[in-house]
Amino acid sequence: MRCPFCGNIDTQVKDSRPAEDHVSIRRRRFCPACGGRFTTYERVQLRDLVVIKSSGKREDFDRTKLERSIRIAMQKRPIEPERIDQMISGIVRRLESLGDTDIPSKVIGEIVMESLARIDTVAYVRFASVYKNFQAADDFDKFVSELRPSAPAEE
């Protein structure tokens, strides 16, 4: 593993243990050249996924990009980081288990929205505002009104 501080390719693993999400290995590394210490994570990847964008463009699935968009939606919400990590790992496992390596971005967005809706409504609305490309306050109002249970009809 290359040292992120000095570029040395000869680093040493000082400690390995399961990460908090229990689906990856956390490794503490040391660079003998500069004395730098850093952490890496190792995860199992069942298959190489390709995202099919709405434009038809294809790009490799990037777990980091998925994680970043979810963390932005969850920003300043009272959700434990471990729960977010578990949710992300669950989404990736679900994508890998779909049986196809080519996955439309729409499918990924829908799976993320399902997961967010179960955990935090505010994060769900935040993510939806970007995913569904809200342009005005009316878009938010319509979306949120669909979330609210309808009042029982008077007889």
From Swiss-Prot:
* Top-level lineage group: Bacteria
Chain segments annotated as transmembrane = none
Give the record's GO biological process terms.
Answer: negative regulation of DNA-templated transcription
Keywords, comma-separated and alphabetical = ATP-binding, DNA-binding, Metal-binding, Nucleotide-binding, Repressor, Transcription, Transcription regulation, Zinc, Zinc-finger
The ATP-cone domain extends over: 49-139
Q: How is the cofactor bound?
A: Binds 1 zinc ion.
Needed cofactors, names only, are: Zn(2+)
Zinc finger map (unnamed): 3-34
Picking any one GO molecular function of the record gives: ATP binding
- Which family is this sequence assigned to? Belongs to the NrdR family.
Job description of the protein: Negatively regulates transcription of bacterial ribonucleotide reductase nrd genes and operons by binding to NrdR-boxes.
Its recorded name reads Transcriptional repressor NrdR
> What is the source species?
Cereibacter sphaeroides (strain ATCC 17023 / DSM 158 / JCM 6121 / CCUG 31486 / LMG 2827 / NBRC 12203 / NCIMB 8253 / ATH 2.4.1.)
Organismal lineage: Bacteria, Pseudomonadati, Pseudomonadota, Alphaproteobacteria, Rhodobacterales
| Gene it is expressed from | nrdR
